[in-house]
């Protein structure tokens, strides 16, 4: 099985939107309010991610199986952290991983971990040594995945969305 990460292209947008919608439905079925009621990734946001070349896709053979975005702009939500703090070695600049989703037909095969680790590698190849990610407090599957990938829980951040509390994680690389 051929598995690799590549930058998304404009022609990938319909497949990316389908994966995001698949993820939204999975979250809803699990009772997780993340990405619900108009919050979360949409066509405009994802098209901008692709245009800025920050959107990556996990390919399995010739099939787009997953998506994630590497943001190196300062995230206002990550500036204020509650119930903890960023690691002492934190940089003034960092890369945040956002909008991670895996097509449900590929779940249960360890590919979400491959996607997350591949995004970390891509961030490091771009020079990032401080990598951050956050997820909803009820998204236990993502929390497990984040920890398994080597991230450490640092505290809570608040996003400017409904039910915006998120658990924030960080990884410091050399």
Q: Where are the language model's segments positioned?
A:
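Conserved N-terminal entry element of GNAT/NAT acetyltransferase domains
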Residues: 1-14, 22, 174
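Conserved GNAT-fold acetyl-CoA-binding loop/helix
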Residues: 25-45
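Conserved beta-hairpin
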Residues: 53-70
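Conserved acetyl-CoA-binding loop-helix of GNAT-fold acetyltransferases
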Residues: 102, 108-121, 144-148
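Conserved active-site alpha-helix within GNAT-family acetyltransferase domains
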Residues: 113, 125, 138-155
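Conserved GNAT acetyl-CoA-binding A-motif
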Residues: 116, 123-135
């Amino acid at each position: 099985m051929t598995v690799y990460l590549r930058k998304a292209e404009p022609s990938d947008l319909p497949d990316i939107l389908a994966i995001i919608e698949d993820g939204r439905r999975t979250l809803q079925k699990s009772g997780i309010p993340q990405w619900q009621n108009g919050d979360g990734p949409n066509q405009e946001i994802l098209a901008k991610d692709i245009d800025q070349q920050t959107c990556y896709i996990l390919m399995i053979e010739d099939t787009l199986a997953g998506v994630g975005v590497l943001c190196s702009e300062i995230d206002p939500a990550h500036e204020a952290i509650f119930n903890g703090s960023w690691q002492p070695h934190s940089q003034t600049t960092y890369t945040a991983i956002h909008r991670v989703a895996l097509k449900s037909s590929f779940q249960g095969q360890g590919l979400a971990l491959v996607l997350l680790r591949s995004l970390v590698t891509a961030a490091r190849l771009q020079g990032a040594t401080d990598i951050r990610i956050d997820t909803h407090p009820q998204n236990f599957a993502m929390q497990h995945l984040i920890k398994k990938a080597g991230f450490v829980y640092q505290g809570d951040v608040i996003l400017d969305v409904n039910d915006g509390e998120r658990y924030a994680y960080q990884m410091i690389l050399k």
